[in-house]
């Protein structure tokens, strides 16, 4: 006799769909019999520069210790982060990617009968983390593709324990300013933990986008999450972190898996954090690449959503799925975002200049075919 194990799962889990990542290069190569080296992937917001040379050197040095468990407390990385982020060591929580931090929050603070509030067109992990623990996901309609913070505030009720906000937002790239953030934080009830997801904050230097760290001291119900997957180029190693009050950090560490960040990731993240030249190059490449894609969209008569991330959403003015498939046949992988409620858009990662040109030419060809 076999049971229906889908029906036996939590109701919230039954309603979820598995997370779908950007299509891997090898998968497309197998499907279309293409040379993997000929494929351009601009689908997963990865850093086109590759990893920092200093991070790669640190990984090589750490290889001899693979038989040993990593430092479960991540002391070296926490110390560097505490110094750079102007916090105490006991305010830092390390995660297996920043999505691990989001799940730790859900595991610690959400349960059946409670809810989390987040925006439409927001990161797919928010509903996954929320519903996986049996809590209710309260999705607030977006405003001009971004967070409607007053509406999100109005959605908070006595059963709300967490609000997820992202600045800049993924997948839209939209952002809000310091005054809007401060006004929001002032009015959020003290019993609600605000998770400020800053996965792309490094790309927004010099803009009007606020630094969440500037608000930590004033708001004990604020947690800032960040990652080494984007601007630091360590996506494969899965390392992120959260910054909060010591009390919140202590709670998260109670539900954190032992050794959740591996030794190679710890070593690489420490080295990457010190490589200011690499980070500056990443920012410069992203800025010029964004300008290149915007100019290309303008020539094609397409509109786009202004972005502060390392990606941009282009509006095709039609259902994007056939164009996405056409680009795949041209050996170019981007990201359809219909599952985010954006069926006419494609999200495109900023690549190297040649990759951006290849994408724009492929897009021109696919659109011309109709």
Swiss-Prot record:
- Can you state the subunit structure given in the record? Homodimer.
Q: What family does the entry list? A: Belongs to the class-II pyridoxal-phosphate-dependent aminotransferase family. Histidinol-phosphate aminotransferase subfamily.
Q: In which pathway does it act?
A: Amino-acid biosynthesis; L-histidine biosynthesis; L-histidine from 5-phospho-alpha-D-ribose 1-diphosphate: step 7/9
Q: Which reaction does it catalyse?
A: L-histidinol phosphate + 2-oxoglutarate = 3-(imidazol-4-yl)-2-oxopropyl phosphate + L-glutamate
Q: What gene name is given for the protein in this entry? A: hisC2
Q: Which UniProt keywords apply?
A: Amino-acid biosynthesis, Aminotransferase, Histidine biosynthesis, Pyridoxal phosphate, Transferase
| SUPFAM superfamilies attached to this UniProt entry | PLP-dependent transferases
Protein's name according to its UniProt entry: Histidinol-phosphate aminotransferase 2
Q: Which CDD domains match?
A: AAT_like
Native organism: Pseudomonas fluorescens (strain Pf0-1)
């Amino acid at each position: 006799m076999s049971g229906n194990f889908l029906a036996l799962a939590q109701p919230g889990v039954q309603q979820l769909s598995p997370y779908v990542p950007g299509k891997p290069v090898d998968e497309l190569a197998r499907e279309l019999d293409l040379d993997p080296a000929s494929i351009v992937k601009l689908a997963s917001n990865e850093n086109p520069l590759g990893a920092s040379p200093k991070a790669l050197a640190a990984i090589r040095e750490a290889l001899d210790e693979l038989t040993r468990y990593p430092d479960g407390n991540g002391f070296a990385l926490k110390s560097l982060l505490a110094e750079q982020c102007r916090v105490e060591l006991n305010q830092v929580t390390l995660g297996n990617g920043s999505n691990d931090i989001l799940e730790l929050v859900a595991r610690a603070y959400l349960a059946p009968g409670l809810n989390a509030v987040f925006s439409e067109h927001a990161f797919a992990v928010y509903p996954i983390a929320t519903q996986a623990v049996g809590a209710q996901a309260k999705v607030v309609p977006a405003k001009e593709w971004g967070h409607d913070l007053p509406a999100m505030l109005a959605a908070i009720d006595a059963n709300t324990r967490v609000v997820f906000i992202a600045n800049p937002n993924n997948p839209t790239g939209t952002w809000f300013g310091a005054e809007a953030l401060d006004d929001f934080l002032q009015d959020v009830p003290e019993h609600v933990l605000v998770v400020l997801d800053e996965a792309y904050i490094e790309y927004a230097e010099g803009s009007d986008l606020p630094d969440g760290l500037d608000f930590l001291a004033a708001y004990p119900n604020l947690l800032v999450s960040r990652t080494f997957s984007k601007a630091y180029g360590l996506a494969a190693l899965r390392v992120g972190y959260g910054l909060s009050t010591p009390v919140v950090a202590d709670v998260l560490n109670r539900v954190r898996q032992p050794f959740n960040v591996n030794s190679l990731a710890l070593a690489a993240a420490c080295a990457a954090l010190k490589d200011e030249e690499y980070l500056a190059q990443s920012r410069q490449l992203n800025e010029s690449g964004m300008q290149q894609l915007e100019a290309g969209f303008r020539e094609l008569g397409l509109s786009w959503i202004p972005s502060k991330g390392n990606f941009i959403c282009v509006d095709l003015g039609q259902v994007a799925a056939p164009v996405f498939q056409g680009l795949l046949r041209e050996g170019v992988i981007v990201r359809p975002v219909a599952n985010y409620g954006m069926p006419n858009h494609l999200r495109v990662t900023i690549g190297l200049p040649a990759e951006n040109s290849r994408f724009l030419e492929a897009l021109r060809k696919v659109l011309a075919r109709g």
